[in-house]
C-alpha cells in the first residue's frame, strides 16, 4: 500500500510549476559567494534546491555542539528569493568525530576489513549506535525547520545503498540472523530454502547463520544465502530510511518525504517497488551513458519510474548537465543534449528537473563533475543552456504540463529486482546474463518498432494489459507463474524471453525440463520442454559466437534444445547446429 501522494509546493504565487534546480552545497563556499549564487539561480529560472545533503559535520561539528546559523542564513536567503528548499536529513555522511568515538559504526567489506571513513555512507545501516546519532540529528532538524515556510520537502539520506549496500560487519551478521528467523521461523525451513545439504552446510540454529563473506578465491557462495543477503540489505536500508522519516514526521508531519532512487544504465540496485510505497513522491537520479542508445535507456528508466509512481508526477532529483567524473572515460554531453534529456524526462512524467550540482566544486572527489554553473562561470555555453532550459520548463509549466499523466501502453515489460539480483550470481551458466539490460533491450526494440511499452514491477498488478513480456525473468515463484497462467487464460498474451522461469524464489531449479516454473505450469503453457541449454560466444571455447535462425534472427548468448508439443506450440523459426560428434541439435 503506497503512502498518500503529496507533492512539494514551489514558492510561486500558486505553488505550482515544474521544479527546477539541483543539489546546492553552500558550505563548500564562503558566504560572499551566496548572493551571487542566488542571483544566478534567478537568472537561470531555478526555483528549488536540495540543501545539506552532506552537511552533518557543519551542523554538528562536535558531539555536544550544534551550529544551525549558516543553515538558517542560506535557507532564509533562498526563500526570500522565491527558491524552495528540499532539506536533507544530512545523514549521507557522518562527521569524523563520530567515527573516532565509535569505530564500531563502520561497515566491513566481504574480507572482514573495516570500510574506512572519509567518503560517504561509511556507516553500517544495522548499527544501533549510528542510528541513535542519526535520528537525533533528524529530530533536531525537524524541530528547527519543521514550520519554516521556505522548507517545502524533506530529502531523506542520499542514494541509499550506493556505498553501504553490502555490509559484512558483526552488526550486519546479528541483524541478518534476526531477519532470517523472522522470515523462516524455524532453522529447518531455512535449511530447506538454502539447500544446505549441498556441501554439508546444515545448521542447528539461527546462531549458526553466516553472512556471505569471502571464503577463498575458488569458493562459491550458496546462491540461496546470497539472494537472501540481497533481500536483507534492501530491507535494512529501507528500515533505516523509514526510521529517519518517522523521526521527522513525528515533529513535522505535513511536508512530503522522498529519497532519491538510482535507476539508470547500470544502477538498479534496490527493490524500488518496495521503496516506492514508503515515499510521498518518487524521485530518481539518472545518469546517461555514452552512445546511440542513450536516449532509449533514458526512456526505459523513466518508464519504470512512471510505474513506481503509479502514474503520478515524479522527481528527477539528479542528472548531469554534461560529463560525470566516476567512469573510466567521461564524455561530455553534446550541444543541446542537456535540454533534450531534461525535456525527455518531462515527457515521461517528471515534474521536477534537478541536477548534481548547482556550482561545480573546486575541490574534492567530484570536482570534475559537471554542474549548472561550471568552473568557467556564467559566461559559458553551458550556463546559457541552463538558462535556456529554465525558460523552456517555465513555458511548459505555464502551459499546464505539470500534473499530466502518461497514457498507458497495452504492453508491459515485467521487471523483477529479485531476478536482477539472481542474474548477478556467480553460479549461473553465464555471467553475461543481465535482467535489467534485457529489459532495456526489449524496451528499445519496441521503440524501434514505432511503439512504446510500459515497464512494470512483476509484483505489481499488470492484469489490465493486453501483453506482458518477461525478459530473462530467471526467477519465478509458483504464485507468479499462476498469475501468468490466469492472465493468458483471460485472453492476455505472454511473451517469454530466454532463461526465464528457471529457478524459484529460493534459487532452486524448477525440475522436469525448462522452463519449469510453477512445477511445470509455465512449460505446459508454452507447449515446449527444454532439455538443455548452451552458452554461445567467443569465450565459450568450441562454441559458435552466434546462431542464425531460419527467420533471419540472430542469437549470440543462449541456445536451447527444445522439444515441441505440436498440438500446443507452433514453430516459427528453426536452426541447425552441428558438432564434431554424432550429436546434432535442431
Predicted regions and their residues:
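Aromatic-lined substrate-binding rim segments of carbohydrate-active enzymes
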Residues: 36-39, 51-111, 244-251
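Conserved, mostly hydrophobic/aromatic
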Residues: 22, 41, 49, 78, ...
Amino acid at each position: 500500500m503506497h503512502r498518500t501522494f503529496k507533492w512539494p509546493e514551489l514558492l510561486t504565487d500558486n505553488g505550482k510549476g515544474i521544479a527546477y534546480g539541483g543539489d546546492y552545497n553552500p558550505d563548500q563556499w564562503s558566504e560572499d559567494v551566496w548572493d551571487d549564487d542566488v542571483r544566478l539561480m534567478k537568472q537561470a529560472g531555478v526555483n528549488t534546491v536540495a540543501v545539506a545533503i552532506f552537511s552533518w559535520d557543519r551542523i554538528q561539528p562536535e558531539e555536544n555542539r550544534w551550529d544551525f546559523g549558516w543553515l538558517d542564513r542560506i535557507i532564509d536567503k533562498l526563500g526570500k528569493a522565491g527558491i524552495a528548499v528540499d532539506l536533507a536529513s544530512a545523514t549521507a555522511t557522518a562527521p569524523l568525530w563520530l567515527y573516532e568515538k565509535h569505530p564500531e559504526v563502520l561497515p566491513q567489506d566481504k574480507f572482514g576489513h573495516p570500510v574506512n571513513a572519509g567518503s560517504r555512507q561509511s556507516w553500517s545501516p544495522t548499527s544501533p549506535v549510528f542510528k541513535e546519532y542519526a535520528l537525533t540529528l533528524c529530530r533536531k532538524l525537524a524541530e528547527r525547520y519543521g514550520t519554516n515556510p521556505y522548507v517545502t520537502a524533506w530529502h531523506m539520506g542520499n542514494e541509499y545503498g550506493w556505498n553501504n549496500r553490502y555490509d559484512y560487519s558483526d552488526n550486519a551478521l546479528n541483524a541478518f540472523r534476526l531477519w532470517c528467523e523472522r522470515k523462516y521461523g524455524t532453522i529447518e525451513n531455512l535449511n530447506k530454502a538454502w539447500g544446505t545439504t549441498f556441501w554439508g552446510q546444515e545448521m542447528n540454529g539461527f546462531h549458526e547463520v553466516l553472512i556471505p563473506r569471502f571464503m577463498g578465491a575458488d569458493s562459491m557462495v550458496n546462491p540461496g544465502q546470497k539472494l537472501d543477503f540481497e533481500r536483507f540489505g534492501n530491507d535494512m536500508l529501507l528500515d533505516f530510511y523509514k526510521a529517519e522519516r518517522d523521526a521527522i514526521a513525528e515533529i513535522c508531519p505535513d511536508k512530503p518525504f522522498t529519497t532519491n532512487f538510482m535507476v539508470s544504465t547500470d544502477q538498479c540496485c534496490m527493490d524500488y517497488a518496495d521503496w516506492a510505497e514508503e515515499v510521498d513522491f518518487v524521485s530518481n537520479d539518472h545518469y546517461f551513458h555514452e552512445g546511440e542508445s542513450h536516449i532509449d535507456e533514458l526512456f526505459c528508466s523513466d518508464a519504470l519510474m512512471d510505474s513506481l509512481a503509479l502514474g503520478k508526477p515524479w522527481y528527477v532529483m539528479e542528472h548531469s548537465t554534461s560529463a560525470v567524473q566516476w567512469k573510466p572515460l567521461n564524455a561530455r554531453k553534446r550541444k543541446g543534449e542537456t535540454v533534450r534529456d531534461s525535456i525527455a524526462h518531462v515527457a515521461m512524467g517528471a515534474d521536477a528537473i534537478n541536477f548534481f550540482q548547482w556550482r561545480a566544486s573546486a575541490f574534492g572527489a567530484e570536482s570534475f563533475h559537471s554542474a549548472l554553473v561550471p568552473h568557467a562561470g556564467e559566461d559559458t555555453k553551458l550556463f546559457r543552456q541552463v538558462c535556456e532550459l529554465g525558460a523552456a520548463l517555465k513555458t511548459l509549466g505555464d502551459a499546464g504540463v505539470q500534473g499530466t499523466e502518461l497514457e498507458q501502453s497495452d504492453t508491459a515489460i515485467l521487471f523483477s529486482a529479485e531476478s536482477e539480483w539472481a542474474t548477478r550470481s556467480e553460479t549461473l551458466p553465464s555471467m553475461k546474463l543481465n535482467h535489467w539490460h534485457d529489459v532495456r533491450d526489449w524496451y528499445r526494440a519496441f521503440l524501434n518498432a514505432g511503439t512504446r511499452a510500459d515497464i512494470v514491477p512483476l509484483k505489481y498488478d499488470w492484469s489490465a494489459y493486453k501483453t506482458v513480456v518477461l525478459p530473462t525473468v530467471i526467477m519465478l515463484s509458483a504464485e507468479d507463474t499462476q498469475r501468468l497462467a490466469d492472465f493468458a487464460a483471460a485472453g492476455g498474451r505472454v511473451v517469454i524471453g530466454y532463461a526465464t522461469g528457471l529457478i524459484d524464489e529460493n534459487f532452486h531449479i524448477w525440475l522436469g525440463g525448462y522452463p519449469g516454473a510453477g512445477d511445470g505450469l509455465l512449460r505446459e503453457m508454452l507447449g515446449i520442454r527444454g532439455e538443455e541449454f548452451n552458452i554461445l560466444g567467443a569465450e565459450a571455447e568450441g562454441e559458435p559466437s552466434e546462431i542464425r535462425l531460419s527467420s533471419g534472427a540472430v542469437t549470440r548468448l543462449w541456445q536451447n534444445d527444445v522439444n515441441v508439443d505440436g498440438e500446443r506450440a507452433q514453430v516459427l523459426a528453426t536452426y541447425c547446429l552441428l558438432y564434431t560428434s554424432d550429436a546434432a541439435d535442431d
